[in-house]
Amino acid sequence: GKSAFTVLVASILHYQKGLKVGVVDCDSPQHSISRMRDRDIESVQESDFLKVALYRQHEQIRKRSYPVIKSNPEEAIKDLQRYIEEQDAVFDVVLFDLPGTLRSEGVVHTISAIDYIFIPLKADNVVMQSSLQFAEVVEEELIARHNCNLKGIYLFWNMVDKRERTESYESWNRVIQKAELHLLESRIPDTKRYNKELSSLKNSIFRSTLFPPDNRQIKGSGLCELIEELCAVTHLDASHTL
C-alpha cells in the first residue's frame, strides 16, 4: 500500500494541484516506484491514446513529470541533495517511499531528516502490530526526544472492508488513542482500483507516475479526502482543490 499511496499523492499534488513534487524511491531492493515509472513509459510508447493524453497534459500544465530518484534508506537524503544540486531543482514537497521496518539499515537516519510520516493501516493483527510498533518507536525515540526534524507521525485506515465489523476498527482506534498516536479521519475503502496500473490496452487511468487518476476513477476512492487532510496537517498549499 505504501508505494501506491506515494504515487497517487505525488501525481495529484504535481499534476493537479500545481505543486512541484519529487519522489525518492528508497524501498530497496524492490524499488516499486522506479519500476512503475519504467512500465508507465513503456505503456505510453505502445499507446496512441496515452501519447496524446501526455501531450495534452504537458500543453495544459507546462511542466514535466516529477522525478523518481532511485536510492536506498542510507543514501536517500544524500541522493536527493545531489539531484537538487545537479538539476538545479526546486521542490514544494518531496515524498519518500521507505521500507516498513526500522530494522532496515539507514531508515532511522532518513526519517530523522524528514518532516512527516504517514502510515497506512489494515485491520489485520499482524499488520497492526508492526505498524503501531513502528509508530510508537518513532514517537518515543525520535519525536519525544527531539532527536529529529519530524513534526508528526500520522496513521490512516486503508483497505477498509465494509463487511468488517465496526467493533474491530473501534477497538483498534482505542489502542491508537491510548498510545497517543494521531489517526487521520480519512478512510480508504478496499477497492480493486488501487491495483490498476497504466496500461496501453486500457484508456482509464488510476495509479500512474505520469498522470493523475481519472475523475471517474477517483470518485468513492477516499483519495480526495485523504489528500485534503494531508495538505491540512502538513500546511501544504491546498488552494488548488480537487
Enumerate the language-model features and the residues they cover.
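Generic structural signal for small/hydrophobic residues in well-ordered secondary structure
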Residues: S32-I33, D115, F134, I188
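Conserved glycine(s) of the Walker
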Residues: G1
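C-terminal boundary of histidine-terminating zinc-finger modules
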Residues: K196-I227
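Conserved C-terminal guanine-recognition region of P-loop GTPase G domains, centered on the G4
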Residues: S131-N147
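Inter-motif core of Ras-like GTPase G domains
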Residues: E105-N125
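Structural beta-sheet core signal
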Residues: V23-V24, F96, I119, L155-W157
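P-loop/Walker-type NTP enzyme "switch/lid" segment
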Residues: A4, V9-V93
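Beta-strand-loop-alpha "switch" segments that mediate conformational coupling across diverse proteins
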Residues: M159-S208
